[in-house]
Amino acid sequence: MDKRVPHPLFKLATELGPLLIFFAANAKFNLFVATGAFMVAIVAAVIVSYVVMRHVPLMALVTAVIVLVFGGLTLVLHDETFIKIKPTIIYALFAVTLYVGLMLGRSFIAILFDQVFNLTPEGWRFLTIRWARFFLFMAVLNEVIWRTQSTDFWVAFKAFGVIPLTAVFAMTQMPLVKRYQIAEATAEASDSERGDTSPR
């Protein structure tokens, strides 16, 4: 199926939109209403992404499934713990997936992030390790915040702290990407090897 490249602002809107709805609903009502609104917004974002791009990035799809599962548990059991540990589960799952990929001689980072650039096997390996460590850091950070801070603070961090932190980290990886990026002339030949971290 044909994949369309969306405007960066569209991608930002589909990622930030549900979080802003979550924050606004929590501020006006409570965490349980916010959780329900967040679940609806996540599903809407996935549908819109598919309509516009003709596909849904794997990371967004996995996140949506976990949001629905843990959000549903939060509402059914009326226990806010489930929605609060949801980010921890997501970050830990991504980190484990990346590390398992390295053990298998593959880098799943290209699939996870729907990347379009081509890197050498060494570059993919370094990038995978860095992102796996970042995900572990975010998992620990989420645990610390929801266990030590108020619900409102945790919601605000989720809405306004996670994306900036991720964006800053991603930007700090650009020198590595440029250093190990495969030249345009050989990029086409490397398509079949994308994400391969096995030694040559």
UniProtKB/Swiss-Prot annotation:
Membrane topology according to the record = Multi-pass membrane protein
* Pfam family name, one: IspA
Identify the InterPro entries for this entry. YciB (IPR006008)
Regions crossing the membrane: 32-52, 56-76, 93-113, 126-146, 153-173
What does the protein in this record do?
Answer: Plays a role in cell envelope biogenesis, maintenance of cell envelope integrity and membrane homeostasis.
Similarity field: Belongs to the YciB family.
| Protein name listed in UniProt | Inner membrane-spanning protein YciB
